[in-house]
Amino acid sequence: MYYRGQHVALIVPCYNEEAAIEAVVRDFRKAMPEIDVFVFDNNSTDQTIQVAQSVGAKVVSVPLSGKGNVVRRMFADVDADVYVMVDGDATYDASAVRNLVDKLLDHNLDMVVGCRETKEEIAGEAYRRGHQWGNYILTQSVVKIFGGNFTDMLSGYRAFTRRYAKSFPALSNGFEIETELTVHALELRMPYGEVMTAYGARPEGSVSKLSTYRDGWRILKTIGRLYISERPFAFFGICGLILALISLVLGFPLLTEYLRVGLVPRLPTAVLAASIMMSAALSFVCGLILDNVTRGRHEMKRLVYLGIPRPDTDSER
């Protein structure tokens, strides 16, 4: 079955979601009967697999722990024209799935993010204030570094085209995968959009797997790693500038003293200043070399991306 001529696949990463997965599958099938549902179980110790199979979902087991490993497997194993990814905790609004897919197809986008908004009476329970602030800070960090205008970078509710999914390398292992999904779209200058979606509390018996500080720290490290790999000249240029300033602070008094009396009063300091200046020069050179390598990598990823056709919305199957 096809929706607007497209094979749409719902891909659901799961870990111990027996209390929620049945509602997820049924709600999305009700909202879009044409959707093909895949549940990717990540070493659950409860009845997640059995419950998902009982409501007709196709279940795939992923032995490597971590959401990033699951996303990598989902994009590799599922063959579809449009992918809708949603967490298996029944917190996202299934009725918004048509809005995400329609916006993806109508505006020829490669990714649409479902931005979370909560009702005031359940906001504290569903979307904790600390998570909201953390999401805002991390989202703004990515926007400042990589550009774009994302509102909810860490949303687990997204729609992708086939060419996005098949060009995404998925290098992260855990919950920081959402950061990588966002940066991938930005670095390849992909068209993307956002749709506001309702966000609710988990059903009774379902427990969050998120750790505010641990996962926040991992996301920060991912942003740093991506900054170094995607903006190497900026990173190593800043490092080189700092080293050069330190060298000048140490060496300038020695230089003025040498010009005045013809002697170097503190030879070890002079050697240190010269060594730091050499390190600064090497940092600049490394930045230039790695910047060219990054450009070449971006070109190759862009060619892979362009080699996959966009969804043909003009034909009906």
What are these regions (language model features)?
Residues M1-R4, S172, I177-R317:
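Hydrophobic helical membrane-anchoring modules
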Residues Y83:
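Short aromatic/hydrophobic "clamp" motif used to bind/position activated sugar donors
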Residues M1-D27:
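N-proximal low-complexity "stem/linker" segments adjacent to membrane-targeting elements
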Residues H7-A9, D36, E180:
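Cell-envelope/extracellular polymer assembly enzymes that use nucleotide-activated donors
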Residues R26-I35:
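Short, acidic, metal-binding catalytic loop of nucleotide-sugar glycosyltransferases
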Residues D41-I49:
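A conserved acidic beta->alpha catalytic loop
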